[in-house]
Amino acid sequence: MKLLMLCREPRLYSCQRLKEAAENSGHQMDILDPNRCLLKLSENSPHFELIYQATMEHEPSRLLNYDAVIPRFGSQSTKMGCAVLRHFEAQNIPCLNSATAFLQARDKWQSLQMLMAQGIAIPHSLLAGPEFQAPSTMQYVQSPTILKTLSGAQGIGVILAEKRQSAVSILETLKQADVSVLAQEFIEEANGADLRCFVIGERVVASMQRISQNGEFRANFHRGGLAEKVSLSEAEKTMAVKATKALGLDVAGVDLIRAKRGTLVLEVNASPGLEMIEKTSGIDIALQMIVHLEKKYQALQNVTKTIELRSHK
């Protein structure tokens, strides 16, 4: 297959591993920055065109004939990245996470609503409108409080407010900056640890426990967190797969936290990093992603052939 990966930083570990796994499996892979793409729609054939400008100095070139797409763009490229994904989806080219699913996962409040609608346990959470006063908001959540911007990854945009007044001040400041924030209960008994489950299709293929360090409450790799192998219960594996399905994702990093009342889903990541979890688990996740994409491509080919056969009868 000729594969396309949408990624702004091709030198990142995850992108390099996926390219390596694809090429070792006999595929060709291009890596393109979605922000350097021009999408063209035309009544004339071809109806969907992708034109790419590698640098400011390069002449734009038309790109054709990709068989499947892997999205790996960050939160700052979500809008254009999803527009490129839809361009391929409209041509029945399989994508390893659809644009719709990507957008749902990237909106933290919407994803929590969708998880709750499927009966999946999450921390108590609040989202107040811009005219709802911050002191009144804090009447409905206990301190300490976690405050999260509605988008962001790698622990960025997540704040721990130890006291009620601190939370009020932060909410008021962010409101002035026109930044929407959700408030969430702090799971103190987790002691700065959470679980990352890497889901592909209907299986948890790898997992790890992340542990915060040096007084930092966030356990993310990019915040200095450490990782260790962990055994998940069958209920936790089922929860991770159910959360992935709830958002319509093929591939996801599902973050769980063990609370006194049971395990909860913190959030679902549509473009989870590979480095920390591959090195901790010893599992070749990149290869499993390529294998899953091969199966998705073949399934779509079979459906297309069936439709063509029926149309000729």
Curated annotation (Swiss-Prot):
Mn(2+) 1 binds at D255, E267. ATP binds at K148, E185, F186, D194, R218, A219, N220. GO terms for biological process: protein modification process; SOS response; translation. It comes from Pasteurella multocida (strain Pm70). Mg(2+) 2 binds at E267, N269. This is Probable alpha-L-glutamate ligase. Belongs to the RimK family. Coiled coil: none annotated. Binds 2 magnesium or manganese ions per subunit. The keyword Nucleotide-binding applies. Residues 112-294 form the ATP-grasp domain. Its cofactor is Mg(2+); Mn(2+). Keywords: ATP-binding, Ligase, Magnesium, Manganese, Metal-binding, Nucleotide-binding, Protein biosynthesis. Mg(2+) 1 binds at D255, E267.
